[in-house]
Design a protein with these regions (language model features):
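Catalytic phosphate/nucleotide-handling subdomain of diverse soluble enzymes
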Residues: 83, 163-246
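Short beta-strand-loop/turn "lid" adjacent to the catalytic site in phosphate-handling enzymes
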Residues: 1-2
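Conserved ATP-utilizing enzyme core subdomain
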Residues: 70-162, 166, 244-254
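Phosphate-binding/catalytic loop of phosphoryl-transfer enzymes
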Residues: 6-10, 14-92
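Acidic-glycine-rich active-site phosphate/pyrophosphate-binding loop
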Residues: 10-14, 56, 132-140, 190-201
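A short glycine/serine-rich beta->alpha loop
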Residues: 22-29, 69-71, 148-152, 205-213
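Generic structural signal for well-ordered alpha-helical scaffold segments
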Residues: 39-44, 143, 159-170, 226
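Alpha-helical scaffold segments in soluble metabolic enzymes
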Residues: 7, 11, 37-41, 83-87, ...
Length: 254
């Protein structure tokens, strides 16, 4: 995404594989998410489960026996939590959800946030980003809730992340027996508690399944790069909406 693979190859003297999204987009897909086939390779098995990545945006990979993996974004993960925390505390993130824990979830505000965003109601495959879920979006939706304390809003935003994930999983793979969590949000103890409460099934970090949560994305793209080098198709049309699987990425030799 930095779009400097030729420069990287020149400076490092190492073959570089990059630009994984373009071929999927050319085939009619959304170009994201791209990690579900790696999740399937690592965590697929004889029981239905989900893998939840909590970066700025939350995305789910659905793994069911004898089925192609499916995946899609569910809404904001850390993007709103971090921005609201930065504005009101000066800290870049809410460590372990401690600030959120000092507030109270407002049920009416939570429902207003969910019901007021059409994207949340749209069916998969779908993806989103900071172009939609940002402080402009949040400020517009808080305009009628000026009486809420910043800590109460933080608590409600944390539950908003958990509830939108739970709603998406219940609609797409209700038989999932567990949820494995990766990304920065897996280190937020408060968010993990909210997820366990909303999902009503075991929730654990991918560390417990053998893959460090903070390295998941890096490992996934290393895997995608190797798939390209081997000439293997890694795109999953059930995930991105493309017309078919494609070999993803472009090689920039050293």
């Amino acid at each position: 995404q930095l779009n400097a693979p030729a420069l990287l190859a020149e400076l490092t003297g190492i073959d570089v594989v990059a630009d994984f999204r373009s071929r999927d987009v050319a085939a009619g897909g959304q170009g994201a998410p791209l990690v579900p086939p790696f999740h399937a390779a690592m965590f697929g098995g004889d029981a239905p489960r989900a893998v939840l990545n909590l970066g700025g945006i939350a995305n789910l990979t659905l793994l069911a026996p004898d089925q192609a993996p499916r995946g899609f974004d569910t809404g904001p993960a850390n993007v709103l939590l971090d921005a609201w925390c930065q504005r009101h505390t000066g800290q870049p993130f809410d460590a372990d959800g401690r600030w959120a824990a000092s507030g109270r979830v407002d049920g009416a505000l939570l429902q207003a946030l969910i019901a007021g965003e059409p994207w949340l109601q749209s069916p998969p495959p779908k993806s989103t980003g900071r172009d939609l879920f940002n402080m402009t979006w949040l400020d517009a939706r808080l305009a009628g809730w000026k009486d809420k304390t910043p800590a109460d809003v933080q608590a409600t935003l944390q539950r908003f992340t958990a509830q939108t994930v739970a709603d998406a999983l219940d609609a797409a793979l209700p038989q999932a027996v567990e949820v494995l969590v990766c990304g920065g949000g897996a280190r937020n103890a408060g968010l993990m508690r909210d997820l366990a409460d909303a999902l009503r099934r075991p929730v654990r970090a991918t560390d417990e399944a053998g893959v460090a949560a903070q390295w998941m994305e890096a490992l996934a793209f290393a895997w995608l790069a190797q798939m390209h080098v081997d000439g293997l198709k890694a795109g999953v049309p059930e995930v991105t909406g493309a017309r078919g699987p494609r070999v993803l990425g472009a090689l920039y030799p050293a």
